[in-house]
């Protein structure tokens, strides 16, 4: 419980349960955080949020979403859960307008993007079947890492911080 509470305190984090058809409980519970990229799509416009900067992109949402998915295909190392790296987010009902021409007669009360996708660097995966927890620190091909030793120690520090947070009792 402490892990869940401490995990959800910051923005751009999520919990995902991998429920399969006919099952009550999923095999994996995935906690994601620390996205290096966030894509937002709204009113047929595309945006990339990276390093706290929001940049308008030229590509239309449908094409860009297809490209994101295509570029994200890679092999998961053996011994890790098949969901050890992912793109997470949501597609609103309004996103159907990227595929079909239907009128937009609804008022935008929520003022949230039609689609929001994030690529988390950090995943904590609980394998409910094997009763194991995996800490995944993703390093993506398009990241420009100059010092891998420094990156290793950053990941190690983050893991130790997480252990400390999850073992601290909160009343």
PLM segments and residue spans:
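Extended accessory regions or peripheral subdomains of proteins
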Residues: 1-13, 18-55, 98-171
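Extended, highly charged
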Residues: 55-62
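FAD-binding glycine-rich core of flavoenzymes that anchor FAD
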Residues: 62-80
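Extended, Lys/Arg-enriched charged tracts that mediate electrostatic binding to polyanionic substrates
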Residues: 74-77, 81-110
């Amino acid at each position: 419980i402490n892990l869940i509470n401490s995990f959800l305190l910051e923005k751009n984090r999520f919990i995902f349960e991998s429920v399969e058809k006919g099952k009550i409980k999923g095999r994996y519970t995935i906690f994601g955080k620390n996205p290096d990229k966030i894509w937002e799509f709204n009113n047929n416009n595309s945006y990339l949020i990276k390093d706290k900067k929001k940049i308008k992109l030229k590509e239309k949402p449908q094409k860009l979403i297809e490209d994101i998915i295509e570029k994200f295909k890679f092999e998961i190392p053996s011994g890790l859960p098949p969901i050890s790296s992912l793109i997470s987010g949501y597609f609103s009902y309004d996103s159907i307008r990227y595929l079909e021409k239907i009128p937009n007669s609804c008022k935008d009360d929520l003022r949230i993007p039609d689609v929001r996708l994030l690529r988390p660097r950090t995943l904590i995966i609980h394998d409910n079947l094997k009763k194991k927890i995996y800490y995944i620190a993703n390093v993506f091909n398009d990241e420009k890492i100059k010092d891998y030793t420094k990156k290793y120690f950053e990941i190690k520090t983050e893991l130790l911080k997480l252990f400390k947070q999850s073992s601290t009792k909160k009343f």
